[in-house]
């Protein structure tokens, strides 16, 4: 197992592989330095910096659609994934390597969130865990929106990939997704002019499991998270030419944007000095019997 942690981009994982076989997705934009990030006037500047990688962290102000709230434009998926780690180091023992990072999203007269990030990477198995603690270091309550945008790419992702989620209900996000609801778990070859399809998954259990396996390369991945930490989970099915990716996205709210979430439901808010923990566990495997 090999993974690349990008200190300049929120200590996210920009590449993940097993036995030299790529499992993650690298978009056409490549690795973009945080200096070049801008939300742009339409709020979609994120897409010009969206390398995808295995995981892109999204938030803290917004996840999902760009929108305006109380006179401020919040861009697609927020900006935390484009903030460099202020401090990063590693420790290790006989069984694991731990990578620790601190990422600060602070502003004068604004929010002051600090992300304490820890990866625990096994030396004996093809597994790792990501643990995050977000702390409100400001003196006022601050809304928090958070998402792990995890991305599966070629050669793990092909028309021969098998895909499983232990959800009890699959809900299309929009009219385009309704067209593909019956095939939500079926992958197809890269297709010209394919329009993305997004599906929400709902669970009866606290432990969500998502798995992808491809017999052609005899590689698979299992991703687990706590549905109490992430009450929503979106599947992004994008089968386009050059934009060929399966996104698995545990999140704290629907992806309709900050203003809509505040209007329709109670948005997660951290009081001064309050913290919130999030985590995800990843297991890579060669044998489908481990499915």
Describe each PLM feature range.
Residues 191-193:
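A general structural motif
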Residues 1-129, 141-143, 151-189, 201-291:
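Surface-exposed acidic/polar loop and edge beta-strand patches at domain peripheries
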């Amino acid at each position: 197992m090999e993974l690349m942690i990008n200190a300049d981009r929120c200590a996210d994982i920009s590449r993940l592989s097993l036995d030299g076989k790529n499992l993650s997705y690298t978009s056409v934009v490549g690795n973009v330095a945080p200096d070049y990030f801008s939300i742009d006037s339409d709020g979609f500047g994120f897409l010009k910096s969206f390398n995808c990688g295995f995981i892109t962290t999204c938030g803290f102000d917004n996840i999902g659609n760009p929108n305006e709230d109380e006179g401020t434009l919040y861009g697609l998926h927020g900006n935390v994934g484009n903030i460099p780690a202020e401090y990063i180091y590693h420790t290790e023992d006989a069984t694991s390597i731990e990578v620790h990072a601190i990422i600060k999203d602070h502003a004068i007269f604004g929010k002051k969130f600090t992300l304490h990030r820890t990866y625990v990477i096994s030396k004996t198995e093809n597994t790792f865990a990501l643990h995050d603690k977000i702390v409100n270091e400001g003196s006022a309550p601050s809304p928090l929106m958070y998402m792990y945008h995890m991305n599966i790419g070629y050669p793990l992702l092909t028309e021969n990939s098998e895909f499983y989620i232990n959800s009890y209900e699959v809900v299309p996000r929009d009219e385009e997704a309704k067209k593909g609801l019956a095939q939500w778990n079926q992958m197809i070859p890269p297709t010209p002019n394919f329009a993305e399809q997004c599906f929400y998954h709902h669970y009866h259990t606290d432990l969500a499991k998502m798995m992808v396996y491809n017999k052609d390369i005899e590689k698979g991945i299992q991703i687990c998270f706590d549905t109490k930490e992430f009450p929503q989970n979106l599947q992004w099915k994008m089968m386009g030419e050059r934009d060929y990716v399966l996104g698995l996205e545990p999140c704290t709210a629907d992806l309709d944007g900050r203003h809509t979430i505040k209007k329709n439901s109670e948005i997660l808010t951290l009081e001064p000095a309050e913290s919130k923990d999030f985590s995800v566990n990843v297991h890579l495997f060669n044998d489908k019997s481990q499915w």
